[in-house]
Amino acid sequence: MARRDYDPATAPPDDRPAVKARAFDTAGPRAWRGSLAGEAIGSANTILAYATDTIGEGPRLHVHPYDESFVVIMGHARFFIGDEVIDAAAGDVLLAPAGQPHRFENAGPGRLQTIDIHHSPRWIQTDLD
């Protein structure tokens, strides 16, 4: 089904050039890990690739002054966002609202791979534990 959400004549194209940058290496069987600050490519979002093969492992409890979205690419995770505990699997997308403490861990079995989208041109974080 075709989408026609706006009239392109009412919103002129952005004059920025297309940009390509590498956030992580995909060669070999190892987990994808890396990041790319949005400001490096003129974007409003910073992208992180996170992965672990260890059950129970994940980022420590932390908070940002902006929203963070998570896309589970592979495996199963348990997210702790504010007072919520949310189980997620490959294909799920989650949101940690600005100012809400959050963390996640590999719920297994196998590898957990996520793409984490910081809705900021740079990564700003305070660890809470």
Identify the role of each PLM range:
Residues 33-34, 48-64:
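Conserved short histidine dyad/triad with adjacent acidic residue
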Residues 61, 79-80, 96, 102-108:
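Short beta-strand His + acidic residue motifs that chelate non-heme Fe in jelly-roll/DSBH
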